[in-house]
Amino acid sequence: MEVNTYLNAIILVLVVTIIAVISTSLVRTEPCVIKITGESITVLACKLDAETIKAIADLKPLSVERLSFH
């Protein structure tokens, strides 16, 4: 009887491991992209917490007048 319980425990661990591997491989995460052009700022697939929102709010589109080339 102990061998049967041991085998059941091993099978349970294997099934749980396989389910975990499959579920994590199905979840795809997109990289956070912040695109700044001369006309707009676009935020794609970013996790927006208070700090990120504050940082994005301070951004401005690029303009040649504000760029300096030294």
From Swiss-Prot:
Location of the protein in the cell: Host endoplasmic reticulum membrane
Pfam families cross-referenced by the UniProt entry: TGBp3 (PF02495)
GO biological process, any: transport of virus in host, cell to cell
Keyword Ribosomal protein attached: no
Main location, first listed in the record: host cell
Organism domain of life: Viruses
Cytoplasmic side, ranges: 28-70
Bilayer-spanning residue ranges: 5-27
Keywords recorded for this protein, A-Z: Host endoplasmic reticulum, Host membrane, Membrane, Transmembrane, Transmembrane helix, Transport, Viral movement protein
Residue ranges annotated as Lumenal topological domain: 1-4
GO cellular component, one term: membrane
Family: Belongs to the Tymovirales TGBp3 protein family.
Functional description taken from the UniProt entry: Plays a role in viral cell-to-cell propagation, by facilitating genome transport to neighboring plant cells through plasmosdesmata. May induce the formation of granular vesicles derived from the endoplasmic reticulum, which align on actin filaments.
More info: TGBp1, TGBp2 and TGBp3 seem to act together for cell-to-cell propagation. TGBp1 is the main movement protein that physically cross the plasmodesma with the viral genome. TGBp2 and TGBp3 would facilitate TGBp1 function.
Name this polypeptide is given: Movement protein TGBp3
Source species of the chain: Potato virus X (strain X3) (PVX)
Taxonomic lineage: Viruses, Riboviria, Orthornavirae, Kitrinoviricota, Alsuviricetes
